[in-house]
Amino acid sequence: YISFNTTAEQKLARKIFGMHMAPHSIVSVGIELSAPSDWAVTQEKYNLPDEYMLYVGRVDQGKLNNVYTYFLNYKKVYPNSDLKFVLVGKQYSDPFNHPDIIYTNFVEEQEKTSIIQHAKIVINPSLYESLSLILLEAMALKKAMLVNGNCNVLKEHCHKSNNAALYYTNEKSFIDKLHMLDSSTNLRLEMGEKGYSYVNSNYDWN
């Protein structure tokens, strides 16, 4: 018997295995977040800025795709933006040396919760996901999400959540969507509420 996390994942397996696929269904998971650490202490410890786009996960080129280039080109198009790019997670590739890009490496779970809470925008640039726990964790904390629309699972979350996450498919759409989020507090708040409702309705252990 096969359990899938999302419809997109199920469709991909059907496409590959066709009539030979074992019995299957979609099984949702629940989200459990640790209590947040003290923000002032965490911010000082990792030298975190006040405004940042956040990535949480394995820090390697295979997961990040073109997001370094896209982000730095965004800063060239919108030089007045104070947004920085913070990456949380173990590094598996050489760091990108730039003053607007900050690495924390591994953090404790309580620190991770606090860092997500204080992010302006949370991003998942991965091309391959079966669910994306960071997306669900960020939505549970009412954060606006920006995701890679070339990943069917992430794109499905955007549609099913009534656009609690926005997706991009190339550099231009990345820059356009990021500017929308960076420049509109109301949009971020609206998306945060949608995401919170989406997670509570679909990914609650209760």
Predicted regions and their residues:
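Conserved acidic donor-binding segment of nucleotide-sugar-dependent glycosyltransferases
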Residues: K160-K172, M180-T185
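A short, well-ordered alpha-helix in the C-terminal region of glycosyltransferases
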Residues: M180, L187-S201
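Acidic anion/phosphate-binding donor-loop and adjacent secondary structure
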Residues: R14, I26-K45, P49
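A short, active-site helix/loop in glycosyltransferases that binds the activated sugar's phosphate group
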Residues: Y1-P23
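Aromatic "clamp/platform" in nucleotide-sugar-dependent glycosyltransferases that forms part
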Residues: L127
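Conserved donor-binding/catalytic core segment of Leloir-type glycosyltransferases
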Residues: S3, Y46-L64, F71-L72
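Short hydrophobic beta-strand element within catalytic cores of glycosyltransferases
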Residues: A144-N148
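Nucleotide-activated donor-binding/catalytic signature segment of Leloir-type glycosyltransferases, i.e.
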Residues: G89-T113, I121
